[in-house]
Amino acid sequence: MSRELIRTVDAWNKVKIARDPNRPNTKFYINEIFDEFIELHGDRNFGDDKAIIGGIALLNNLSFTVVGICKGENTKENIKRNFGMPHPEGYRKALRLMKQAEKFKRPVICFVDTPGAFCGIGAEERGQGQAIAQNLVELIGLKVPLISIVIGEGGSGGALALAVADKVFMLEHSIYSVLSPEGFASILWKDSSRAEEAASVMKITAQDLKRFNIIDKIIKEPRGGAHKNPIKMAQNIKKTILEALGEMKGTDLDTLLNERYNKYRNIENNL
């Protein structure tokens, strides 16, 4: 990605940056931000979806449950992780781990980076829509602090299933939308080649979503994008997580849950 392109930072350029194959993924951030991480597997029903990483982590002697949608770092790993498109068993694994966090009173940190939930026949047969809907229902009432960070693409319900949280953050050049610009252009204008125009109309950038109060904060990226200095980006995310937890530390559970509920109930008033 050229320096000139980064400087332009219009919506379509941000789409390109968010999709950059060299952009740090969830696995990288987990390894860089947390002192220790033990990965847990499976949804206890069908199998283990490699598109979602989850487990228990330590940071500054505090325990967390960390769950994230992960793209691959190369073609082989992308195939293994289904290019960051989770199956229903992935969302059920995520929910299993978050309910476990509730039981043991661990805060939950979610990383979101997906073009969307996988829409194959098998995924539909195993209840993709139900799995996503169940996550939305459960997360709105989960009795622990929840932080969600969009680190690249935040595509549709597949992203939202890990993004109902007390604090929702986006990296500076990430995107978050109901569907891809290509999909939007194809459906509304019957012309996928108008994706660049669609990206601007859709208001999918972190700056747009902060203005509408859909998200709580934009995390600044290093000059040139997160992939130019991944370590610095991880440090920025770590600092933001710790600051957010500090803000929520003195909040009693009832207040936390009421504020989370009202946050989503009142979104329409900001549009």
From Swiss-Prot:
Residues 1-247 form the CoA carboxyltransferase C-terminal domain. InterPro entries: Acetyl_CoA_COase_a_su (IPR001095), ClpP/crotonase-like_dom_sf (IPR029045), COA_CT_C (IPR011763). It comes from Clostridium perfringens (strain SM101 / Type A). PANTHER family: ACETYL-COENZYME A CARBOXYLASE CARBOXYL TRANSFERASE SUBUNIT ALPHA, ACETYL-COENZYME A CARBOXYLASE CARBOXYL TRANSFERASE SUBUNIT ALPHA, CHLOROPLASTIC. It is found in: Cytoplasm. The keyword Amino-acid biosynthesis does not apply. Belongs to the AccA family. Keywords: ATP-binding, Cytoplasm, Fatty acid biosynthesis, Fatty acid metabolism, Lipid biosynthesis, Lipid metabolism, Nucleotide-binding, Transferase. Pathway: Lipid metabolism; malonyl-CoA biosynthesis; malonyl-CoA from acetyl-CoA: step 1/1. Component of the acetyl coenzyme A carboxylase (ACC) complex. First, biotin carboxylase catalyzes the carboxylation of biotin on its carrier protein (BCCP) and then the CO(2) group is transferred by the carboxyltransferase to acetyl-CoA to form malonyl-CoA. GO terms for molecular function: acetyl-CoA carboxylase activity; ATP binding; carboxyl- or carbamoyltransferase activity. It catalyses: N(6)-carboxybiotinyl-L-lysyl-[protein] + acetyl-CoA = N(6)-biotinyl-L-lysyl-[protein] + malonyl-CoA. Its EC number is 2.1.3.15. GO terms for biological process: fatty acid biosynthetic process; malonyl-CoA biosynthetic process. One of its GO terms (cellular component) is acetyl-CoA carboxylase complex. Acetyl-CoA carboxylase is a heterohexamer composed of biotin carboxyl carrier protein (AccB), biotin carboxylase (AccC) and two subunits each of ACCase subunit alpha (AccA) and ACCase subunit beta (AccD). The keyword ATP-binding applies. This is Acetyl-coenzyme A carboxylase carboxyl transferase subunit alpha. Pfam families: ACCA.
